[in-house]
Amino acid sequence: MIEHAPYVLFRDDSENRTTVFAEPSRIVTARTKAEFDHGLKEVEAAHRGGKWIAGYMAYEAGHLFEEKLAPFAEENRETPLMSFGIFDAPAEEHPLATPRRRLENEPFLSEPRAGWDFSVYRKRFDKLHQHLRQGDCYQANLTMPVHARWSGDPLAAFWSLIERQPVKYGALVALDGPILLSRSPELFFRVDTDGWIETHPMKGTAPRGATAEEDAAIIAAMRSDEKTQAENRMIVDLLRNDISRVTEVGTLDVPKLFDVETYPTVHQMVSHVRAKLLPDTRIAEIFAALFPCGSVTGAPKMRAMEILHELESGPRDAYCGAIGFIAPNGVMRFNVAIRTISLFPDGRAVFNVGGGIVFDSKAEAEYDECLLKARFAVGDAEIAR
């Protein structure tokens, strides 16, 4: 289905840097809880044996880190719970790192259709809002699928998406399961050589203005908007709690709060949380503490995940999971797999869109925001619904 597979490609558009992991010695894939538990141990052993690890973990894997949520993780689905390649090193000057242009005249994605029309969205929004009013949760990230057909070369399509919306945490994954094209602007976490872990939760979205003056006014409004700040602060507090489970007391810091990053179609509010990992923290312990990222669940995290499982029409799969790599020296970097398209061998393409719902959210505005976020994949094409 794709030449040079299996491989994983990472792309930081801000630094014009492409990193390729090709020809894995083996691939660790899990589709059941037993395979998942064994796979995490296999990944840890490979890491401690001096290997590089690159791949992804699906959103539903997060259910397996909490006994109460474990029954929600369906087994033996098309999309694995995780798939990681074991590599000797990143490939040097690999042909996959060379930009490739699409040769086809038709769009890479065709026939996009929202999984929910507005009436369906409103019903699920209203049920979620009832939970908010009852105090079951304070925020939940309600998402819906967009279905399409794909054709052509996924690698060329990946490069064409870069032109549409540059991001720092892009990735193309061709391991087991669907091919993943990820155009994520959000860092889940990174770890440096000294053991400092940092996460950049992204919560709060506004459309771009038509002029620089309009953009400046929109950014100023975002920074002063109590609803946007409240959404972001809830997730910052959640991640402070998550990250404290695996870090040294007294090292937790929030170096950036309510920053705004600008992309071709939207402005996003982002904050930074940082702390020092406890000595000898294992990979599985980091994921058990943090995964999935609180920005794509809600708060309180476990209750929000229960409510979302009840409301959403199917598994998120790779969407809202994490894609990244682990180096032998302990350096790690994973994105939050938002703006991520799953390509299946039969021509199906699926990507999800969503947003954080709080007490004063409005269904119409939230649905419009979902469709705005879908533009990363389909541009200005009409999305049927």
Name each model-derived stretch.
Residues 1-385:
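Extended alpha-helical targeting/anchoring segments
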